[in-house]
């Protein structure tokens, strides 16, 4: 099973003939602004504050959450003004490190991160309207095996569409739809 923060790689696996079943979207990620600074309320307006010198986001060329962050800033005409403050992580994990270590005063990340058991309740975060960015499709594909079929992998692939999985995903800040 290959699980991805977008559909690009699951689709590439299918196009390469390596998928046992078609890739599918199992949830949609949500974008938030997050800060570990005491007394700082993350908001798009507050990104312009002179006390904010670094804004973390994942590299928009390769990371879906970085692409979404860039879209939000473009829709609010903030990108030119904030360009000098932007600090790019090569992944959402590195971006989160910039935020949690306060190397960046604020950053764009996944809601699932701020709701995770190890980080829940740390810092302040603000959800950003999903209307401001292209939906962040979370994808999964079942990969072919040369040997016998892996029934555990198939069960997990199917589980991601179950009501139990959807409830778990919602608890961790993902959006799920009935048709998924």
List where the protein language model places each region.
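Internal catalytic or translocation cores that form aromatic/hydrophobic pockets or channels
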Residues: 1
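Exported/periplasmic ABC-transporter solute-binding proteins
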Residues: 4-17, 22-180
């Amino acid at each position: 099973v290959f699980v991805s923060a977008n559909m690009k790689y699951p689709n590439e696996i299918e196009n390469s003939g390596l998928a046992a079943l078609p890739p599918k979207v199992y949830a949609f990620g949500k974008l938030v602004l997050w800060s570990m600074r005491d007394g700082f309320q993350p908001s798009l307006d507050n990104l312009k504050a002179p006390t904010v010198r670094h804004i973390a986001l994942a590299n928009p060329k390769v990371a879906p959450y970085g692409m979404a962050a860039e879209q939000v800033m473009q829709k609010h005409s903030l990108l030119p003004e904030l360009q000098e403050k932007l600090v790019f992580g090569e992944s959402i994990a590195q971006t989160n490190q910039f935020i949690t270590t306060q190397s960046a005063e604020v950053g764009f990340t996944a809601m699932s991160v701020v709701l995770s058991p190890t980080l829940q309740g740390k810092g302040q975060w603000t959800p950003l309207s999903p209307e401001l960015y292209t939906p962040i499709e979370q994808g999964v594909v079942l990969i072919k095996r040369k040997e016998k079929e892996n029934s555990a992998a198939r069960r997990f692939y199917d589980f991601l569409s179950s009501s139990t999985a959807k409830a778990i995903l919602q608890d961790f800040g993902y959006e799920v739809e009935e048709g998924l």
